[in-house]
Amino acid sequence: MFKPLALLFLLLSAPLAAQPAPIAPADLLRHIRILADDSFQGRAPGSEGERLTTDYIVRELAARGLEPAGENGTWLQPLPIVETVPGASEVRWTARGVPVEIAAEDIALSGNEEVKRLTDAPVVFAGDGTRLAGVDFHGAAALVLAQAPAGSPPLRQRVRALTDAGAAAVIVVTGADVPWNLIVAGFRRGSTRLDSEPLPNIAGLMPARAAQRLLAAAGSDLGAAPAALPIRVSMEVHTDIHRFTTNNVVGRLRGSGATGENLLFLAHWDHFGFCRPEGAPDRICNGAVDNASGVAMMIEVAGGLAAGPRPPRDILFLATTAEEEGLIGAGWFAAHPTVPLGSIVAAINMDTVAIQPAGSPVAVIGRGIPALDAAIDATVAAMGRRLDNDDEAAELVQRQDGWALARAGVPAIMVGGSFSDMALLNRFLEGRYHEPNDQADGELVLDGAAEDANLSVALGRRLADPAAYRRATGGGS
C-alpha cells in the first residue's frame, strides 16, 4: 500500500491520458498541403488523383485506430458514375411547316448515348415544369423554364418529372440572372451523374431570348400555360460518354457500448481535377479550402475522439465523392447506407473551413431539432465560444452534403465559424472558389479552423453519448 505522500506524488506526476492534445493549425495544414498538392491532380473522381486521395484518407484513419466500415469489410463504398461531354449537334425547327432559325450558339445539347436522333418530334411548352397534368409529353421535346416560384421542386426534379412523363428531349430555358456564355461554357465541360439516374434521351439548354423567338413563331410566349405547340424539331446529338466507378471512404470508431447507434462525421474529398485547357499557366484546381480543409478537419477530429475515452455510440467518418457534381456520394450513402440509416443519431458535415480567424462566432446550418440544438448550444458554451444566431447561413443548406442526408431523414448539421460571417464567405466564393488558385498557400486561415475542429471533438463526445443526447423520432433537419 502506498503511503499518503507517495500516493499524492504519483497522482500529481502521472500524465493525464484522458486529455488529448488540442488540434492545432499545423495539424490541419499538414493534410491540406498533401491533399491539395499538384501530385493529387485536383482529386477528380475516377482519376489517379482519386486513388491517391482515398489511399491517403484510409491510411490516416487507420493510423488513428479506426476500422473499415465500407462495403464487404473494406474502407470503400463504390458507386457507378457516368460522365458525359457534349459533342457536335444538328437541330432543325419548323413552326407550322416554316423553318425557324435558331443560332447554333443558342442551344447546347447532350445525349444519354453516343449518338441520339429525334426526327420530326412535337414540341411542348412545359412552363416552369410544376403543372404537367393534362399535357401529353410522350415522344416530345419539352421546353421548361429554369426559374420557378419559391417552394417549387428543384430543376433536377422537374426535369426528371418530364422524363417520367415521356419527354424524349428536355430543353431548359435559362433566365437572365446568369450570363448565357457562362452557362453554356459550364454545360459544354460536361456533367457527372449516377449511372442509374434516368435522363431524357436528349437534354439541353437554350437562352430565354432564343426560346422567345421560337415560341413567337408559333404565336406563343414564355408566359403561356403548358401546352403543345405547332412546332416540330429534328435533332442529331453526339456525346462523349465515360463510365467509371468512384468511391466513398467509410471508417468506424468503435464505441464503448453496444448501443446499435451511430454518430456520423462527413466531408467531401473530391474537386475538379484538371480544370483548365492544355497550355494554361495552371491547369489544376487543387481545392485546398474546398475541401481539403474539411477532410483535414475530419481526420483530426477522428484522431481527437480516438485519443480520449470512447463514448458509448460508434462514430462513423465518411469521406464522400462527387459532391461537386451534386452531392452524389452523400446521396448514394443515404440511399445505400453501410449501417441502418435510422441508427444515425446525427450527421456533422465539414466543408470549406479554412477561411475564418480564431474567435469567430459559431454558426449552425440545420437548426430546428430541439434536442440537437440544445446539445450544440451546451457544447459551444462549454468551449467558451459564442453562437451566431442571425441564420444568414441557412441559404447554404441545400448546397452541402448534409442536405442529402437530411432529405433521407437524418438530423444533419454544419457547425463552425466559416459561415458565421457571410461577407467573408462570399469573398471566398467570388474569388478563389473553384479556381486554380485555391491552393495551400499563405492565404489559408487555419486558427479558426483549429478552434472549430476542437469544438467538433467536444460536440462528437456529447452526441455520441446517449445520456447527453437522444435523437428525436420523426426525421432529420
Task: Label the model's feature ranges.
Residues 41-141, 148:
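Noncatalytic luminal/extracellular "stalk/propeptide" segments of secretory-pathway proteins
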Residues 19-22, 38-48, 63, 78-80, ...:
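Second-shell loop/turn segments in exported
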Residues 23, 27-30, 34, 48, ...:
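Extracytoplasmic/secreted proteins, especially bacterial periplasmic and envelope-associated proteins
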Residues 105-134, 193-287, 300-303, 307, ...:
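Soluble metallo-hydrolase cores and metallopeptidase-like ectodomains found primarily
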Residues 192-193, 199-219, 258, 310, ...:
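Metal-dependent peptidase/peptidase-like ectodomains
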Residues 303, 307, 424-477:
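His/Asp/Glu-rich mid-to-C-terminal helical/loop segments that flank catalytic regions of hydrolases
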Residues 99-202, 259, 283-286, 390-391:
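Extracellular/luminal Protease-associated
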Residues 16-70, 182-183, 253-254, 473:
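N-terminal hydrophobic or amphipathic helices/low-complexity stretches enriched
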